[in-house]
Amino acid sequence: MEFLTKITQQLGLVGEIDKVGSVFVLGEEYRPYIFKTQGKADDAETAFGSFLGNAQTNPQLLSDIETRIFFTYRTQFTPIPRDEEGPSPINLTLFFRDNPINTLENVLTDPDSFYSDIGWGCMIRTGQSLLANAIQRVKQTREFRVNLENIDIKEMSIIQWFQDDWKYPLSLHNFVKVEGKKSGMKPGQWFGPSSTARSIQSLINDFPDCGIDRCLISPQSADIYEDEMIRVFEENKRANVLLLFATRLGVNEINSIYWSDIFQILKSSYSVGIAGGKPSSSLYFFGYQNDYLFYLDPHQTQSSSLDMDDNSYYRSCHGHRFSKIHISETDPSMLLGMLISGKAEWDLFKDEFKNSRIIQFVASKPSDDIYEGVDLSPGSVSVHSIQSDLQDTGDYIDVGNFMSEKANSSQPSKNEEFENVKCKNQRILICENPSETEIEQVLVEDSTTDN
């Protein structure tokens, strides 16, 4: 059995890990392969080792990856009632991704409730994965390694907090609930990075037993307001602070100027991962090798945790099966997670990222918000007016809409130059000729909030 497990692991990973180049997993560095030259092995294992060129994936690397907690689509969970103005729980995707009998039963017995998050919950699942690994680090340290043959009681309690039912504090159900209250998000609507960050912040604030003392979010940038961090550590110099940055690092793809900064984040010991990936298809990134990002995919469908015994549920939240994607193919919208434990780490963190092109340290929150004093509560007249002018694609403004009338202009495109402008409240001045000007206001939230 042990040998078969090794075969499964090796065949699953040999195509993902290159033999050249260190692998970085949330601050840990590994040689990708080790070469067996000593010790005895049976004939089958020897033959398999020859098939791999006597190379064996580094077991310490595998153990670290296996220890990462991750969550996926689930079916037949506690129902989430549909909002009258929200999307329908019934869609064709369910018939292909779920058991058709389950789907048909739900349609016939309760067509106005969601029994699965297939097709809309992947950003929540990757946000849960990021949060779970942050909590795991607080509760069990970075050195903890999972043993799937023997459930760790402390880690099991962490995983149970995420089960799909209203009574569990970090469930998908409660992600939907708190964001619905904050922004009017409806069940079945796809979350963006900012929505996920706000949900995590609210859930942490309501659940101090998770071990994270404060969660500071930057909904549309990676700015850290130092005065806020100072206040946190004045109250508790050992505070565990989760920083969440919902940011966009390009137009259709990550601008190559930021590649090294993304690698620096995943290489950092403060990183708890990145949620993002592709438009409307979020992944959980936990490491990289060369120019490839390693990720866990939430789009595999599993049964409800409530229908599993503890052993099965525990194993379903771990595993070696991961994939990789070249950084140039990833979507620029993402949620970055960093965990700072105590004032001493904060000082080291600032020094480590002082030259980052993504993470920016700002003395205090600026007060020149172009919408300061405007009612931005869900459903307000002001919000309706703004939304009618702006197309929100996953929490981010598509600046291309503002430029659409200029697309056929003979003037050369300046989009690449605009990508590197580091301004939050922008007034874009468009000049086709000296006699015609047009000014557009673009709202980009930059506040680091702690509500």
Curated annotation (Swiss-Prot):
Keywords: Autophagy, Cytoplasm, Hydrolase, Nucleus, Protease, Protein transport, Thiol protease, Transport. Cysteine protease that plays a key role in cytoplasm to vacuole transport (Cvt) and autophagy by mediating both proteolytic activation and delipidation of ATG8. Required for selective autophagic degradation of the nucleus (nucleophagy) as well as for mitophagy which contributes to regulate mitochondrial quantity and quality by eliminating the mitochondria to a basal level to fulfill cellular energy requirements and preventing excess ROS production. The protease activity is required for proteolytic activation of ATG8: cleaves the C-terminal amino acid of ATG8 to reveal a C-terminal glycine. Disruption phenotype: Impairs the formation of preautophagosomal structures. Blocks the maturation and subsequent localization of ATG8 to autophagic membranes. Interacts with ATG8. This is Cysteine protease ATG4. Its EC number is 3.4.22.-. Its main location: cytoplasm. It catalyses: [protein]-C-terminal L-amino acid-glycyl-phosphatidylethanolamide + H2O = [protein]-C-terminal L-amino acid-glycine + a 1,2-diacyl-sn-glycero-3-phosphoethanolamine. Kluyveromyces marxianus proteins are shorter in length and have a more ordered secondary structure than their S.cerevisiae counterparts, which might contribute to the superior thermotolerance and solubility. K.marxianus could be therefore useful as a new model organism for further elucidation of the molecular details of autophagy.
